[in-house]
Amino acid sequence: MIRKELPLPEGWEEARDVDGKVYYIDHTSKTTSWIDPRDRFTKPLTFADCIGDELPLGWEESYDTQVGVYYIDHNSQTTQIEDPRVQWRREQERMLKDYLVLAQEALLAQKEIYQVKQQRLELAQKEYRTLNDVWKHKVGSQTSLVSGSSSSSKYDPDILKAEIATTKSRVNKLKREMVFLRQELQYKENGYQTLKEIDLKMSKNHCAYKLDEAQAILNEMKTIKKAITSGEREKQDLIQSLAELKNGFLVDKGSQSDLWASNTSLASSANSLSRQYLNVSSQTDISGNLSVVSNNHLAEKVRLQLRYEEAKRRIANIKIQLAKIDSDAWPGVLDSERDRLILISEKEELLKEMRFISPRKWSQSEVERLESEKKQLEEDLQAARDTQSKALTERLKMSSKRNQLVKELEETTRLIASLQAQLKCLSTSMQSLSSGSSPGSLASSRGSLVTSSQDSSTSASVSDLYYEQLDHLDSEYQNKVDFLIQEGAMGYRPSGCITTIHENEVVRSQKTDPANRVKALRSLSGTPKSMTSLSPRSSLSSPSPPCSPLVTDPLLTVDAFLSQIDFEDIDLPLSFTELNVNAGGDSYQHETDEEPSGQGLSCLGVSSLSVAGVSAAVSDESVTGDSGVYEATNQRTLMENAVFDGEDSEMMDTAKIKIGMKYDEKNKHFAVFVIQLDNLAALLLHQNEKLYIRVAVLPCSESTSCLFRTRTLEQSDTLLYNEMFLVSTSHSALRQKTLRVDVCTRQSNHHEECLGGSQISLADVCHSEEQEAHWYNLLSYRYLKRQSKTSKQKISCCEESGIENPDSVSALLKQTAAELEAVRKQIGESTDPPEYIWPEKKDNVPDEDGISENEGEEEFDGDVQCETEESDMQAATDSASVKVDKETNTEGLAMSLSSVRPKDKRAATPMQAPFIRGNTIIRSKTFSPGPQSQYICRLNRSDSESSTLSKKPPFVRNAMERRSVRVKRPSVKSTGSERLIRTSLDLELDLQASRTWHHQLTQEISVLRELKEQLEQAKRLGENELPQRVKDDETFKVMLRQVEKQVQKIEQKYEMQADKMMRAAAKDVHRLRGQSSKEPLEVQSFREKMAFFTRPRMNLPTLTADDV
């Protein structure tokens, strides 16, 4: 029976209060109640009796504008925000306890990392003092490495200077790292204690907040939010004042300090635009023919729009991939495991430094303690590697892939911001040329990514705390984690990611998906169906009837994409660069059966297949001494047999090392990859000698690390190192340096002996983000030493016998010069001298991978053929005649032809006719430039923008009011996000997170104030240079570099736009993850809240001292 059909019991009455809410009066007991007395017969008495969403007797669901849905228990006259029907609160408490265990493990691992770093710092300080004493007192002989010195090579002046500079840099770096680690440890420990207190508070007596308590917590959070917003504004003001103060100091442009004056991609992209694109004041300001300028505008705009659309699609794909990864692994679960791997890496560094230290002035007890510590470290590292699980490696692979996707997302958002700026500039220019309409149409039609996040950069929201900030690991930590992952799964590369400076897996290099590359080629260099008519029917700037403008741009050709191919992918069936040297037999063979065509690469001047000069390599198949001359094997064999005899003639092979190099323009880092060492027998090794590689970038500056050593390995036919080292330097300074690579061993008396080496010029290092790896021959110092002894003995014998015997090296050089002259004459007879000119450096030095002379000549012919083809085409284009209307201005005819895209070139045709329109250009009489009759030409905003690609269906009459041809964005009704179940534990976590955020912001503001005081004090003292502490700290460099960008108006808009897009992308990833995840949204949200307290966001360091 329905409750309303039942009569009220005797003595009961129904009434309403002032708010209209129904209550009941019991006249018998003279009491009032919110509970209908008839509910005793219709509602379940307990929760166990409830079916579906029913509430038992005495419970009521209500709504508060501030708190939301809450529940009233009329039986106990209490309120609560948790739904009594859901056991979510109990599940939250269990999850919190589990997370506390993981957080404690991560905290212990990080404390151990701090202790290991402290040991490394003490060891580095001792080593620095020892090297300083050696330098001051000039201990040991300073014989040259080239002369074959062994134990005294430790005191080579250049190497010793590099040792001192590197050790000093390592001391300062370890000090800064310990400061950061101490801050991070303090943050994590405070967060762990906060979570522990919350767990204790909420689990004790099952604490639950009532309505008034929840309202008080929300009011406090609102107050904290206002304080955070004002603090962000103060932080921006401090950054602005810091930028103004910094401008008053001098910056050394020749050192690594040129990081301060960096140009962003927006500036470079704006400079790449024609001056005509930037001048939009009047039509009369445009030089040349109006139709030519307008056509160039149109072609450039179409090209930028296609790139813009492609970048938007790429961002959408990255968001989906990030959402999938985040849904598989919840935040914070990998922290303890990652810290354990970093601890292993730190112990390896400590072990390496212990092995390479020179304990000459140490006591016997200190030396014994050092040896015992080394043995203990070796045992710990071996045990840690044995216990490393496969599941851990897989999870860390996903984390590494996520970091790579985040970096790609950041770069793509910057690209979109740059393209938007260029499109807006072009759109404004075209409006001024054609219709004079107001600028800003791009923002309404193309700002979909930006308009979705138009929040202020200084506004604060508590919900923003738990959005993933999409930050990746520190570069050095990322390198360590990647190498440790690689040890677990050799050659792993996550698919669909880009190669960055933070990736160290040098065995396999990343290659972009061919399907995506082909798709990009079709979308850029092809002629889409939607481009059948781009010219407006009523525009004076139209040079021809409506047709598709064929743009000629180097960015749109196939060659441009070929230049981005990674030639180090060993999975390719046709490898371009893995062509090993075969000096004496079949020990090194080509990995490819046929020669790949290099014409497309040579057209763009790509230097991926050339090798930098090696100055210390006189071995087989290499350059001779400092001459940089290549000699093939078949030419050297007879000469070697003639010059050397006995056991020396058996040494046909030479030791080789594979070195990879890459320069990161963004971070100003030069990466050196030590990959592989081959043919060690040529170094004349002794038994039981352990080898390591010493890398030095010379000359070395005082404030940078420039000398590095790999780990020590036992002798083998092939040694795989796979280690990477970073050098902070500008590109201009790097081109003045030399990379010195030595194979060394450590003697029993702790002296360092160099067995072989090579010097590689860095003058040709390019800005490419792709790693370039090549094989380099090593000069055997022991072999040279033995050879010099042999020559001395022969000379002395000749002097005694009276027979004149020339020096071996002189004979070698004479023979080389004679053979080179013969080769040049032979090449000069087979080619036409007037047309072909030899390149200066790279094209006449083939790769050191066994390519014969004939193959080199064929590649050279391909290069010349491609260049000649382009020059012939340009000449034919310039001399072509086109029929035009007699009133048409033909002043800029050549420029108009340059904006027409030619059809695909065929490399097999050396002389190809240029693409010329065959039909006569007949202009419309209505809109001819010459005034043939009286008419009125009305240009509106629609006509000016009809030159862009229309994404609407064909025009249908009476379908809609035709006011504009511009793309209309569909109106999307904003639907509120699904309301999550909120518990008292959620409220407590939100409150503590807000307090933590505000506390951290306060600390950052205090650091900025302190830095401002230091700069102001230095300015008052009349100092012209920045304080050394600021110049040496990488974090403050990055901060002040971004500060400098915010000062300039254009850069500020560009950076803020990219930052808004990243925030919007983070929220989109958060939303997509909630949709794709198999777990409820409440579980994901609660995990993010817990992880916030143990994942610090350290933006600014504290100010530290610089003293060594």
Swiss-Prot record:
Residues 846-861 have a biased composition (Acidic residues). PROSITE patterns: C2 (PS50004), WW_DOMAIN_1 (PS01159), WW_DOMAIN_2 (PS50020). Residues 434-456, 523-547, 828-861 are annotated as: Disordered. The keyword Manganese does not apply. GO terms for cellular component: cytosol; nucleus. Residues 111-247, 294-329, 360-434, 998-1065 form a coiled coil. Residues 533-542 have a biased composition (Low complexity). GO terms for biological process: negative regulation of cell population proliferation. It is found in: Nucleus; Cytoplasm, Cytosol. The keyword Transcription applies. Residues 653-776 form the C2 domain. Keywords: Coiled coil, Cytoplasm, Nucleus, Repeat, Repressor, Transcription, Transcription regulation. Residues 6-39, 53-86 form the WW domain. SUPFAM superfamilies: C2 domain (Calcium/lipid-binding domain, CaLB), WW domain. It holds the Pfam family C2. The C2-domain mediates homodimerization. Homodimer. Regulator of the Hippo signaling pathway, also known as the Salvador-Warts-Hippo (SWH) pathway. Belongs to the WWC family. KIBRA subfamily. This is Protein KIBRA. The gene is wwc1.
